[in-house]
Amino acid sequence: MQVFRAVVLFILAGLAEIAGGYLVWQWLRADRSIWFGVLGAILLVGYGFLPTLQPQVWSFGRVYAAYGGVFIVLSLAWGWLIDHNPPDQPSLVGACLALVGAAIILYWPR
Protein backbone atom coordinates (compact mmCIF):
# COMPACT_ATOMS: atom_id res chain seq x y z
CA MET A 1 0.00 0.00 0.00
CA GLN A 2 2.90 2.37 0.74
CA VAL A 3 4.24 2.00 -2.81
CA PHE A 4 0.81 2.62 -4.35
CA ARG A 5 0.27 5.73 -2.20
CA ALA A 6 3.74 7.07 -3.09
CA VAL A 7 3.14 6.57 -6.81
CA VAL A 8 -0.28 8.24 -6.68
CA LEU A 9 1.13 11.23 -4.78
CA PHE A 10 4.03 11.56 -7.22
CA ILE A 11 1.62 11.46 -10.18
CA LEU A 12 -0.72 14.03 -8.62
CA ALA A 13 2.22 16.32 -7.80
CA GLY A 14 3.58 15.94 -11.32
CA LEU A 15 0.26 16.72 -12.95
CA ALA A 16 -0.19 19.77 -10.71
CA GLU A 17 3.31 21.04 -11.53
CA ILE A 18 3.12 20.41 -15.25
CA ALA A 19 -0.44 21.68 -15.69
CA GLY A 20 0.32 24.72 -13.52
CA GLY A 21 3.45 25.55 -15.47
CA TYR A 22 1.65 24.96 -18.76
CA LEU A 23 -1.17 27.35 -17.80
CA VAL A 24 1.28 30.07 -16.75
CA TRP A 25 3.12 29.49 -20.05
CA GLN A 26 -0.15 29.88 -21.96
CA TRP A 27 -0.91 33.12 -20.12
CA LEU A 28 2.52 34.69 -20.64
CA ARG A 29 3.67 33.19 -23.94
CA ALA A 30 0.45 32.45 -25.83
CA ASP A 31 -1.43 35.61 -24.80
CA ARG A 32 -4.18 33.77 -22.95
CA SER A 33 -6.34 35.28 -20.22
CA ILE A 34 -4.84 36.14 -16.84
CA TRP A 35 -7.12 33.44 -15.43
CA PHE A 36 -4.82 30.87 -17.01
CA GLY A 37 -2.04 32.34 -14.88
CA VAL A 38 -4.17 32.41 -11.74
CA LEU A 39 -5.25 28.78 -12.14
CA GLY A 40 -1.67 27.83 -12.97
CA ALA A 41 -0.44 29.49 -9.77
CA ILE A 42 -3.05 27.63 -7.70
CA LEU A 43 -1.95 24.32 -9.21
CA LEU A 44 1.69 25.14 -8.53
CA VAL A 45 0.90 25.77 -4.86
CA GLY A 46 -0.83 22.37 -4.81
CA TYR A 47 2.29 20.84 -6.31
CA GLY A 48 4.32 22.27 -3.44
CA PHE A 49 1.96 20.76 -0.88
CA LEU A 50 1.50 17.22 -2.26
CA PRO A 51 5.03 15.88 -1.66
CA THR A 52 4.66 16.65 2.05
CA LEU A 53 2.13 13.80 2.20
CA GLN A 54 4.80 11.21 1.36
CA PRO A 55 5.88 8.79 4.14
CA GLN A 56 7.68 10.39 7.09
CA VAL A 57 10.60 7.98 6.79
CA TRP A 58 11.72 9.65 3.55
CA SER A 59 13.70 12.86 3.71
CA PHE A 60 12.94 15.94 1.62
CA GLY A 61 15.93 15.27 -0.63
CA ARG A 62 14.96 11.67 -1.34
CA VAL A 63 11.34 12.54 -2.06
CA TYR A 64 12.24 15.30 -4.50
CA ALA A 65 15.02 13.31 -6.17
CA ALA A 66 12.69 10.37 -6.74
CA TYR A 67 9.92 12.71 -7.86
CA GLY A 68 12.27 13.89 -10.60
CA GLY A 69 12.04 10.50 -12.28
CA VAL A 70 8.26 10.61 -12.26
CA PHE A 71 8.31 14.21 -13.49
CA ILE A 72 10.40 13.20 -16.50
CA VAL A 73 7.89 10.53 -17.53
CA LEU A 74 4.89 12.79 -16.98
CA SER A 75 6.51 15.65 -18.92
CA LEU A 76 7.07 13.39 -21.91
CA ALA A 77 3.49 12.11 -21.67
CA TRP A 78 2.15 15.68 -21.45
CA GLY A 79 4.18 16.70 -24.49
CA TRP A 80 2.82 13.74 -26.41
CA LEU A 81 -0.84 14.02 -25.37
CA ILE A 82 -1.27 17.79 -25.04
CA ASP A 83 1.34 19.26 -27.41
CA HIS A 84 1.21 16.33 -29.87
CA ASN A 85 4.98 15.88 -29.73
CA PRO A 86 5.67 12.15 -29.18
CA PRO A 87 8.86 11.16 -27.37
CA ASP A 88 11.61 9.53 -29.41
CA GLN A 89 13.42 6.32 -28.46
CA PRO A 90 16.27 8.02 -26.54
CA SER A 91 13.70 9.97 -24.52
CA LEU A 92 11.86 6.76 -23.63
CA VAL A 93 15.08 5.00 -22.64
CA GLY A 94 16.10 7.97 -20.50
CA ALA A 95 12.68 8.05 -18.83
CA CYS A 96 12.94 4.35 -17.98
CA LEU A 97 16.39 4.89 -16.49
CA ALA A 98 15.05 7.81 -14.46
CA LEU A 99 12.29 5.61 -13.02
CA VAL A 100 14.81 2.93 -12.10
CA GLY A 101 16.88 5.60 -10.38
CA ALA A 102 13.83 6.88 -8.51
CA ALA A 103 13.02 3.37 -7.28
CA ILE A 104 16.60 2.86 -6.10
CA ILE A 105 16.58 6.18 -4.24
CA LEU A 106 13.41 5.30 -2.34
CA TYR A 107 13.48 1.55 -1.90
CA TRP A 108 17.13 0.42 -1.78
CA PRO A 109 17.67 -1.24 1.61
CA ARG A 110 19.51 0.95 4.08
UniProtKB/Swiss-Prot annotation:
Family from the record: Belongs to the UPF0060 family.
GO cellular component assignments: plasma membrane
NCBIfam families tied to this protein: PRK02237.1
Transmembrane regions: 7-27, 33-53, 63-83, 89-109
Superkingdom, natural source: Bacteria
Residues annotated as signal peptide: none
Entries under PANTHER family matching the protein: UPF0060 MEMBRANE PROTEIN YNFA
Keyword terms: Cell membrane, Membrane, Transmembrane, Transmembrane helix
Keyword NADP belongs to the record: no
UniProt keyword Protein biosynthesis, yes or no: no
Topological category with respect to the lipid bilayer: Multi-pass membrane protein
Compartment list: Cell membrane
Pfam assignment, any one: UPF0060
UniProt-recorded name of the protein: UPF0060 membrane protein Haur_1798
Main location: membrane
